[in-house]
């Protein structure tokens, strides 16, 4: 909305490849960008990837080395971008903020597609898995003129309450094994936190 785009919320599409292909064929002609929520994984009822391939779409990536958000896809059909978000609510929100918002900005204007990040001081300790980037829901606060970040809520891609009260994402690079209190870390504030 803030970019001047007009979103259209489609009803839930049945987990049926024929129905999905029929609906996607119509949507591709009508809209400048398609965003799916769920169906991007590799279960028996996840058909989006195979339908896109069947429609001669180009799969740009499918699955990411991030947490949450591993089952995230990006494709295009007839030059229309198709984002396929994970089904878990927190993973979907994280991927939307990291990838889809950048895609929308790029479609509207090639300027400023990079994420806005600030460096803050960690007020927590966290073990991390090497080899994947991790995004924790976080909360900024100020103490004695210093900006700190704390983990907000419980971890997990399905724990929606971790977004409640969070005002950004704590970014942990794939080569970090542990975050200690006092470490300098990257924080990606939600836009509304900057207002």
Per-segment meaning from a language model:
Residues 1-36:
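Phosphate-binding glycine-rich loops and their immediate beta-loop-alpha structural context
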Residues 10-13, 38, 85, 172:
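Active-site-adjacent beta-strand anchor residues
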Residues 17-18, 42, 93:
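Loop/helix-junction capping segments adjacent to catalytic residues or to phosphate/diphosphate-binding pockets
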Residues 34-48:
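Glycine-rich beta-strand-to-loop/alpha-helix junction loops that act as flexible
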């Amino acid at each position: 909305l803030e970019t001047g785009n007009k979103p259209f919320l489609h009803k839930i599409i049945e987990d049926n490849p024929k129905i999905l292909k029929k609906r996607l064929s119509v949507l591709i002609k009508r809209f400048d960008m398609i965003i799916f929520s769920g169906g991007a994984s590799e279960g028996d009822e996840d058909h989006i990837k195979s339908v896109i391939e069947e429609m001669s779409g180009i799969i740009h990536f499918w699955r990411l080395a991030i947490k949450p958000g591993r089952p995230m896809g990006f494709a295009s059909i007839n030059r229309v971008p198709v984002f396929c978000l994970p089904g878990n609510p927190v993973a979907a929100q994280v991927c939307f903020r990291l990838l889809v918002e950048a895609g929308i900005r790029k479609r509207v204007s090639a300027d400023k597609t990079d994420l806005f990040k600030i460096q803050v001081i960690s007020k927590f300790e966290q073990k991390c898995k090497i080899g994947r980037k991790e995004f924790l829901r976080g909360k900024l606060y100020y103490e004695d003129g210093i900006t700190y970040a704390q983990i907000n809520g419980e971890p997990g891609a399905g724990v929606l309450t971790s977004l409640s009260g969070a005002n950004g994402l704590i970014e942990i690079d794939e080569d970090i094994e542990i975050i200690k209190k006092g470490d300098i870390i990257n924080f990606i504030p939600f836009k509304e936190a900057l207002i």
